[in-house]
């Protein structure tokens, strides 16, 4: 098994697929070393243990929403795209998401996935509670000030089986992609460009004097929509994929269309091609 880009190979002696918290405890007690596996998207070998890997593909996909407190308890193995659909149905949203909807909530937050938007914190900042099993097979709950040391725990504190996130009210998003922003113009106006709307992402191959694509996601209640021209960039007239030449069918809605936040808040849709 390899990660999405093929540069990391998983060579565990045993892959355990727990279906309960008791299964997690049993696996920990039976092994010398255990690592948890998320969506296998990481660029490095953080989850590539040669001993025992825990895969949460068979673990119950709990998404427990408390509408009054705007909090959601999410199980390991649940993908961001799945959580987004459930939250939107309850009138709620996540304050930030990554580019890809197929990454797992627990895996992405544990490894510091950042999302986009100069006004937004990284994904782990939404965590208000962590539930895990430590190396002794004991239940541990982390809240309050201890979260500062635990949110991006890199799997070192134990096997996380649930996290609770603080959500916000659902909102609509408009997405426009701009082509060929002059690189020097981008750099000289970097803060203004990247902080212009709720979420801004730049794609460049560093091969010429242009930023190939600039993806702007506008919060329809709080942002001023950009026009057809944006800092020397021009709004695309057709749907684009972040990778030039790739099939645009998997890209989220663009061309200034307005829709619920799960429709355009990531760059790609569920299901996502693992090769992208």
Question: Predicted regions span which residues?
Answer:
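Glycine-rich N-terminal segment of FAD-binding domains in flavoprotein oxidoreductases
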Residues: 6-102, 109-117, 202
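Terminal, non-catalytic protein-protein interaction segments that mediate quaternary/complex assembly
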Residues: 21-25, 35-41, 159-161, 181-183, ...
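Short acidic-glycine loop/turn motifs at beta-strand connectors
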Residues: 49, 66-68, 134-136, 206-209
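Short polybasic amphipathic segments
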Residues: 61-63, 128-133, 216
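FAD-binding subdomain of flavoenzyme oxidoreductases
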Residues: 108-196, 207, 223, 227-234
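Loop-centered beta-sheet repeat module
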Residues: 198-199, 204-244
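Conserved small/polar residues in nucleotide/adenosyl-binding loops
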Residues: 266-272
């Amino acid at each position: 098994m390899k990660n999405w880009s093929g540069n990391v190979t998983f060579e565990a002696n045993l892959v355990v697929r727990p279906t309960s918290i008791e299964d997690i405890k049993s696996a920990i007690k039976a092994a010398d070393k255990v690592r948890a596996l998320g969506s296998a998207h990481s660029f490095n070998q953080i989850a590539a243990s040669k001993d025992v890997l825990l895969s949460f593909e068979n673990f119950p996909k709990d998404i427990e929403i408390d509408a009054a407190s705007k909090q959601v308890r999410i199980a390991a193995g649940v993908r961001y795209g799945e959580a987004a659909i459930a939250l939107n149905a309850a009138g709620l949203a996540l304050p930030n998401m990554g580019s890809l909807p197929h990454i797992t909530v627990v895996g992405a937050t544990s490894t510091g996935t950042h999302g986009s938007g100069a006004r937004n914190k990284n994904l782990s900042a939404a965590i208000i509670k962590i539930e895990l099993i430590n190396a002794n097979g004991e239940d541990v709950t982390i809240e309050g000030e201890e979260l500062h040391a635990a949110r991006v725990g890199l799997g070192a504190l134990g096997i996380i089986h649930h996290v609770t996130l603080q959500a916000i009210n659902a909102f609509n998003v408009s997405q426009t992609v701009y082509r060929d922003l002059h690189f020097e113009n981008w750099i000289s106006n970097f803060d203004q460009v990247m902080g212009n709307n709720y979420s801004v992402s730049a794609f460049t191959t560093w091969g010429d004097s242009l930023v190939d694509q600039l993806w702007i996601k506008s919060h329809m209640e709080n942002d001023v929509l950009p026009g057809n021209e944006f800092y020397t960039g021009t709004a695309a007239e057709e749907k684009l994929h972040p990778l030039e030449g790739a099939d645009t069918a998997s890209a989220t809605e663009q061309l200034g269309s307005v829709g619920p936040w799960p429709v355009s808040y990531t760059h790609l849709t569920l299901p996502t091609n693992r090769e992208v």
